[in-house]
Curated annotation (Swiss-Prot):
GO terms for biological process: DNA recombination; DNA repair. Its main location: nucleus. One of its GO terms (cellular component) is Smc5-Smc6 complex. This is Non-structural maintenance of chromosomes element 4 homolog B. The keyword Methyltransferase does not apply. The gene is NSE4B.
Length: 383
């Protein structure tokens, strides 16, 4: 027996020595790895400037906020059963703490802690409400106690003493409940005529026979001669560009103004805007704020498509109040655009001439028809 015990002790001693040797051989490797990693991290990190006291203070504040949120989550878990009780004010106190801490949150880590705390509070309230609905909801005694707490004149409850009488503030209770049960009681009257007769239904009309479509008619072809004609704006643009070719550099008010017609001044502005849009005219501003108009060659289409040339647009406000000071500012005789004659009188004359020709044609047709009728009567009489 002694020999066996000695043998076992020797075996256990050898095993323990081997384990210690192995552990001692492994520990320096771990230490070396840690040292290497530390040296690598130190070599990778650049030399950072010393942290200021304000940043250290901000980090400390953030840690304090996170610790407060952690304590608040533990508090929510501990008070899980008391949050939805009628007599308990823990829910209000916890939600006030969450709101106060939320005012201090500035960084994402604290925002995550704030969201987690609010989520824990919501989950605890939802679980407690579900448990109450599963067990039958609020009992009648709890409902009456809640009414007494809210609208009772004394602080006594039904559980305190059965013989005590509790007076209620029925008026306040009625005001709070009336918003949910608003029902208006009106008079039972009849709206509409006193004698109402049944309207007879109209008899249905059978489907009308549809006529077959006739033969296709080909419309007459009309020459587009009017489309080829230039509009008034194109003519004004051509006249204005020729004026700019002759004078090279002109003030905008001298070019646009028509002293006798505000409408033609607006038309000149319209023509100038098209020239600017096409790139054929350039508007510049000198040091005194005067606007000058100069002719230029329009850019090629490929330059516009490639983006090398870009158009700049602007909005100009011009009305009768602007036209009056412009006519005073420009001297008489310095207007460049000519006065265009209106075609209203000519159009009215042509229209009256056309109407006269139509009337004459109608009279001729009537006379010819009468003559034909007389001829037929004479023929019949002769026979």
């Amino acid at each position: 027996m002694r020999n066996s015990v000695k043998w076992e002790t020797e075996l256990t001693g050898d095993r323990s020595r081997r384990r210690e040797a192995d552990e001692s051989s492994e520990t320096p490797k771990i230490v070396k790895k840690e040292k290497r990693s530390k040296t690598v991290i130190a070599s990778l990190r650049p030399q950072q400037p010393p942290i200021q006291e304000e940043e250290e203070q901000g980090i400390a504040d953030r840690r304090a906020i996170r610790s407060q949120y952690l304590a608040l989550t533990h508090k929510i878990k501990d008070a899980k059963d008391d949050l939805t009780k009628i007599d308990s004010n823990k829910f209000n106190s916890i939600i006030n703490e969450v709101e106060n801490l939320h005012q201090k949150v500035r960084k994402p880590r604290e925002q995550i802690a704030d969201a987690e705390a609010l989520l824990d509070l919501t989950n605890s309230v939802v679980s407690s409400v579900k448990s109450q609905s599963a067990h039958g909801g609020v009992s009648p005694a709890e409902f009456v106690n809640a009414l007494i707490n809210g609208f009772g004149k004394t602080s006594l409850r039904i559980d305190a003493d059965e013989n005590t009488q509790v007076s209620m503030k029925w008026k306040d209770l009625g005001f709070t409940v009336c918003s949910t049960v608003l029902v208006s009681c009106g008079c039972t009257t009849m709206m509409g005529p006193m004698y109402s007769e049944m309207k007879q239904r109209k008899s249905r009309v059978g489907n009308r026979k549809r006529t077959k479509p006739g033969a296709g008619v080909k419309p007459e072809e009309v020459d587009d001669t009017e489309a080829e004609k230039k509009s008034d704006t194109d003519n004004n643009m051509a006249v204005m560009f020729n004026i700019l070719r002759k004078n090279k550099r002109v003030k905008i008010e001298n070019l646009v103004l028509n002293r006798k017609s505000f409408a033609q001044t607006a038309e000149n502005m319209f023509a100038l805007s098209f020239l600017v849009k096409d790139g054929r005219v350039e508007i510049t501003v000198d040091n005194n704020g005067s606007h000058f108009v100069e002719p230029r060659n329009a850019p090629a289409a490929n330059l516009v498509l490639s983006g090398e040339v870009a158009y700049n647009h602007f909005v100009l406000r011009f009305d009768y109040k602007d036209w009056e000071p412009m006519s005073k500012m420009v001297a008489v005789g310095e207007e460049l655009m000519p006065l265009r004659e209106t075609k209203v009188a000519q159009d009215s004359i042509e229209l009256s001439r056309k109407q006269g020709s139509v009337i004459q044609e109608e009279t001729v047709v009537e006379d010819s028809s009468n003559m034909e009728g007389d001829n037929e009567d004479s023929k019949n009489g002769g026979l």
